């Protein structure tokens, strides 16, 4: 079994089948940020680095982030994810809501919830003020596939979410996303915003790909790829014509 590896002081990550999740320890509790996809024994893995009691927060409800949730009696999640969690992915368990600007106190260490909608309605990341970084989530990657296909994805909301992050970018220098490159500079946020706007405006040509046995359209914006519904190509071309 892969174990947790140190990310920075009292913070670790675990690679789990193409996705990573995180563990952040304070003086009284340790926060598990997502649970991966393969059902890793998280309590056993965490015991190798901390004896503190564990609590869980999910950055969003996609199954590659909730695969080990059954190991916890309760979890924390933005309420906009609860319908997806229970009704689409049929997950169970007690869910406690977390909202924008909520603070998770681990004992002399606090992580703030930042809402970044778009990839999913209730996607969040955790702001570690003391270490000037964001931990977890899918909205920001380098050389990754950002999934924007399916009924609960929204590219316009994604732009809004990243613009919200950009407004707060003086508070952090680095992002530790759940996929692709481990450490991403905050300076990529404007590039992602512009890339998403270009896709919405029909300025980026897409190519058809098969992902998880589904045909999607891939828009390459140099630093990333947005994977969208096939109908996105037609919609974007129509919107692009409106600007001609």
Where are these regions (language model features)?
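Active-site HxH/HxHxD metal-binding segment of metal-dependent hydrolases
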Residues: 37-107, 142, 195-205
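Active-site-proximal segments of metal-dependent phosphoesterases and phosphodiesterases across multiple
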Residues: 139-152, 186-189
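Active-site neighborhood of phospho(di)ester-bond hydrolases with catalytic His/Asp-centered motifs
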Residues: 32-35, 53-64, 76-81, 116-118, ...
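Short, function-defining helix-loop hinge/capping sites that tune catalysis or transport
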Residues: 23, 42, 68, 72-73, ...
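Short active-site segment of divalent metal-dependent hydrolases/proteases
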Residues: 63-64, 122, 141, 182
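Accessory terminal helices/loops
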Residues: 163-244
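Conserved beta-strand hairpin/beta-sheet module of binuclear metal-dependent hydrolase folds
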Residues: 1-48, 126-142
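Metallo-beta-lactamase
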Residues: 6-8, 70-121, 128-131, 143, ...
């Amino acid at each position: 079994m892969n174990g947790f590896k140190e990310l920075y002081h009292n913070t670790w990550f675990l690679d789990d089948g193409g996705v990573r999740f995180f563990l952040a320890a304070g003086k009284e509790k340790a926060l598990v940020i997502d649970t991966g996809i393969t059902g890793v024994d998280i309590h056993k893995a965490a015991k190798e680095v901390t004896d503190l009691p564990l609590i869980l927060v999910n950055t969003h409800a996609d199954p590659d982030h909730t695969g080990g949730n059954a190991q916890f009696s309760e979890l924390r999640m933005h309420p906009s994810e609860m319908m997806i969690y229970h009704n689409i992915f049929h997950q169970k368990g007690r869910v406690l809501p977390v909202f924008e600007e909520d603070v998770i106190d681990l004992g002399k260490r606090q992580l703030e919830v930042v809402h970044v909608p778009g990839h999913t309605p209730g996607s969040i990341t955790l702001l570690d003020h003391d270490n000037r970084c964001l931990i977890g989530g899918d909205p920001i990657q380098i050389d990754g596939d950002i999934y924007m296909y399916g009924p609960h994805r929204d590219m316009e909301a994604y732009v809004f979410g990243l613009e919200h992050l950009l407004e707060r970018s003086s508070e952090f220098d680095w992002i530790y996303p759940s996929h692709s490159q481990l450490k991403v500079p905050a300076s990529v946020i404007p590039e992602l915003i512009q890339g998403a706007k270009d896709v919405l405006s029909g300025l980026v040509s897409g190519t058809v790909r098969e992902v998880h046995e589904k045909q999607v359209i891939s828009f390459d914006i140099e630093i990333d790829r947005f994977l969208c519904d096939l109908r996105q190509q037609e919609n974007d071309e129509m919107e692009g014509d409106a600007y001609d």
